[in-house]
Amino acid sequence: MARSPRIRIKDNDKAEYARLVKNTKAKIARTKKKYGVDLTAEIDIPDLDSFETRAQFNKWKEQASSFTNRANMRYQFEKNAYGVVASKAKIAEIERNTKEVQRLVDEKIKAMKDKEYYAGGKPQGTIEQRIAMTSPAHVTGINRPHDFDFSKVRSYSRLRTLEESMEMRTDPQYYEKKMIQLQLNFIKSVEGSFNSFDAADELIEELKKIPPDDFYELFLRISEISFEEFDSEGNTVENVEGNVYKILSYLEQYRRGDFDLSLKGF
């Protein structure tokens, strides 16, 4: 393979190099002064005579031009009233991810809203009606985030939390893991409510047999499958024990196939 010929520096190369160096240094200085962000490590400024080939020089010119281009949001910044600085690229990414999470949550609520929910062994309305009486997050265990507003971010730690949370929640596996954790947490809640109660032990074993997505729908549709029923200090022992028997009755119906779990895998 033939080697690329060594570059011959022309006057127009010198002029373009000087212009790009000037613009690059000005960009670095301006960003440091206005936003406190040091971009020195983001772009090299080699001596002109260090380029061995025209290809090397052209590649650097592209990098320098991109670095100083106002359309490159990676190197454009905003500073809010709390002194938090972020690149416009990061702000736009969090906004996109937030919108995607909102879309996913809306889809999930739409898929479940017409399902009946039960209390005391009887249908009491739809999940949508239950949500209207409380909130989507209370019923579904899924929080719908508000629109991202950078002007309200008070600290860098809050910005990182929002960035990481929204990115994580765009992954479909997030919701699968959440269903698994919800089931485990509920089982622990039942376990922590009794020292010795045969029916509770039976309930725990039955709950462990249920696939997480089935459990999630049962959690949505059966009011007795609720953390409040077991964690509330106001509940008497008799009430909690009675709730165990109610849930066991529901699970017997579940095993017989009396519940249409059409949200499975949604």
UniProtKB/Swiss-Prot annotation:
It is found in: Virion; Host nucleus. GO terms for biological process: DNA replication, synthesis of primer; symbiont entry into host cell via disruption of host cell envelope; symbiont entry into host cell via disruption of host cell wall peptidoglycan; viral DNA genome packaging; viral DNA genome replication. SUPFAM superfamilies: DNA terminal protein. Keywords: Coiled coil, Covalent protein-DNA linkage, Degradation of host cell envelope components during virus entry, Degradation of host peptidoglycans during virus entry, DNA replication, DNA-binding, Early protein, Host nucleus, Hydrolase, Phosphoprotein, Viral DNA replication, Viral genome packaging, Viral release from host cell, Virion, Virus entry into host cell. It holds the Pfam family Phi-29_GP3. InterPro entries: DNA_terminal_Gp3 (IPR008770), DNA_terminal_Gp3_C (IPR043124), DNA_terminal_Gp3_sf (IPR037216). GO terms for molecular function: DNA binding; hydrolase activity. The record marks F230 as: Positions the 3' end of the template strand at the active site of the DNA polymerase. It comes from the Viruses. Changing R256K: 80% loss of primer activity. Residues 74-172 are annotated as: Intermediate. Residues 86-113 form a coiled coil. Residues 256-258 are annotated as: Interaction with the viral DNA polymerase. Changing F230V: Formation of TP-dTMP is directed by the third nucleotide of the template strand instead of the second. The modification O-(5'-phospho-DNA)-serine is found at S232. Residues 1-73 are annotated as: Disordered. Acts as a primer for DNA elongation during viral genomic replication. Acts as the small terminase protein during packaging. Recruits the phage DNA polymerase to the bacterial nucleoid. Primer terminal protein (TP) is covalently linked to the 5'-ends of both strands of the genome through a phosphodiester bond between the beta-hydroxyl group of a serine residue and the 5'-phosphate of the terminal deoxyadenylate (dAMP). Interacts with the viral polymerase; this interaction allows the initiation of TP-primed DNA replication at both viral DNA ends. Binds to ssDNA. Interacts with the replication protein p1. Part of a DNA-gp3-gp16 complex. This is Primer terminal protein. It comes from Bacillus phage phi29 (Bacteriophage phi-29).
